[in-house]
From Swiss-Prot:
Alphabetized Gene3D superfamilies for the sequence: P-loop containing nucleotide triphosphate hydrolases (3.40.50.300)
Domain ABC transporter: 19-250
Organism: Salmonella choleraesuis (strain SC-B67)
Purpose of the protein: Probably part of the PhnSTUV complex (TC 3.A.1.11.5) involved in 2-aminoethylphosphonate import. Probably responsible for energy coupling to the transport system.
Family assignment from sequence similarity: Belongs to the ABC transporter superfamily. 2-aminoethylphosphonate importer (TC 3.A.1.11.5) family.
Full protein name: Putative 2-aminoethylphosphonate import ATP-binding protein PhnT
Binding site for ATP: G51, P52, S53, G54, S55, G56, K57, T58
Gene that specifies this protein: phnT
Cleaved signal peptide residues: none
Gene Ontology MF annotations: ATP binding; ATP hydrolysis activity; transmembrane transporter activity
Amino acid sequence: MLMKTTAVHAPASQGTSGIVLDSLRVAYHGNVVLKPLSLTIEPGEVLALIGPSGSGKTTVLRAVAGFVQPAGGRILIGDTDVTHLPPYKRGLAMVVQNYALFPHLKVEDNVAFGLRAQKQPKALINERVTQALKTVGMSDYAARYPHQLSGGQQQRVAIARAIAVRPRVLLLDEPLSALDAQIRHNMVEELARLHRELPELTILYVTHDQTEALTLADKIGIMKDGSLIAHGETRALYQHPPNRFASEFLGRANILSAIALGITEAPGLVHVSCGGAVIRAFSRGSHHGYNKLLCIRPQHLSLTPRSAYSNRFNATLQSVHWQGDLTHLLCDVAGETVRMVLTHVNPLPRVGDKLALWFEPDDAVLIEV
């Protein structure tokens, strides 16, 4: 795969810079494609924006980059209002899929391109190029041309070119989507390592791949129909999604009908009628009422209790799907289908078996319909 990098032409400022979006709104020909959105990305933080096609995630990134003019609101990078500044004055770099490295330039010259555009001294250019190639593990390929590299190697060169200019902010727009699965997996690990080595770099990462987001991001924002419908720390958002769309888009989830009965003695937990049983579940909202939903991740269910406080559903096994290291079970729980994922199950239960499905109260989340 070939990548295009857009880099600043002015020296990046010292220190770290976060991003603040203040009621940012974007419209094309009068049609609103991004509803007023407020979001803060802390300095040195990796924020992943995920969502289906057309949700507005790439529009946010392009607005931050300066390629889309907002219809309202402000964009701040550090303490600077960049809303109306051209891209080259924003102190950022951007890696986008499906655009070529310069085919007539060697790897080292591709990486040096932004620095030369900045008219940096030759000694500084050589130092930055050497360091950037070392950071992405491409030092041995400095004299090669793009056509002599694999897709993953070309991508590393594109990222090296971006970080060589020492941007305040790095924007990544689905940079792994065109790579094969194994290369993509390796590059996710490489990007995680890159941020460990450059902890001062603020990264806005747009992807449709939830695994990339979960692996790389400190925080995740979930977009739908031009709105930010969920935002939070990665683990907390996965563990306790605020709504059905977030729970199902960020990983697989069982969604069951439920009735909230009232608070328990434990903070944050409520009694819930669900699946033919009264259980305890996490809730951040109303503690009473009908028309609630219960969210449980398939991997949070087990065939044995994990503690004295474990919840239990009685279930009938409908199907078994063995997939090597994992076994997927589909069960009937009070007329609703529940999926569970198990490891190292021996012996395997049989279709029609009566099972007890156990889960911890904090792994069950009460959400609104």
